[in-house]
């Protein structure tokens, strides 16, 4: 199939600031497109110009960057708007068999739904209303715009919480979710682990890393003071976390490692007993399936919308966790075995094929 993927926002900005990156090849959506290519589909990926990398790249498929307009109102970090993208879809729609667009609350999904609804999938992640402007724009979109203008497109949710949310506003929704996939070529796995846990996160307030440090310190005091905690990531709270670690006299147990590329991250994840999450606010967290395919269980609260997948398949612990849960994972290898057993079902090519099968079943029923 000839597939157009509409995904203007390639990575998550912080405080409406889009960071400059050297490459987009390590993003979730780029690797998802690779999964479609591995299933012998011809891919074109449409991206907002603000997310264009600083260095020239050669891509595995066609990648087009579109200029954003009305940027003072439609922030490219939140909801990009592009006249050029609308024109491109209108002009080129006949050259594609399928259009896959990210999010119901987005202009690219609105464009595709208006111009070619019969060949449009909206791959939807949000499970709650966006908080901007006291949720008013989000509520207007989901209650008025989506039911009128996006009702003919077919929505495939990325999680069960996303399904339960979007089903309130649209009827043409798949009950079967398709989660974020992982490029298994970038992530190996192993059963044997070191005595260490890992955090992979931006060091920003909503990620609540300080809480993880304190819980890990309680684990050191109560169970095993030889364990290590590796914190991978960068952000505004780096210095504050560094001071906290010193106050706890835990410099020999807790390390702030900064940014790591996929190859480096793979080694650290693969060697760790568990990935730790205690976030205040998140949707689908890509770090969760990345950890699982490394054979590394996840300990998280219930906030991430893909946390249900961990609980259902016994891939870790999902609750308001504490040091006792760290001990449970550290001493129970069955969680690691479950992660290894389910690894293949989280691959990009597996999940892309799953999405196409859902689509084919849908159009055969029409």
What label would you give each PLM region?
Residues 30-32, 138-156, 169:
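Membrane-proximal helix-turn-helix segments that form the acceptor-binding/catalytic region
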Residues 161, 181:
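Carbohydrate-associated surface elements
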Residues 242-260:
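Nucleotide-activated donor-binding/catalytic signature segment of Leloir-type glycosyltransferases, i.e.
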Residues 297-300:
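Short hydrophobic beta-strand element within catalytic cores of glycosyltransferases
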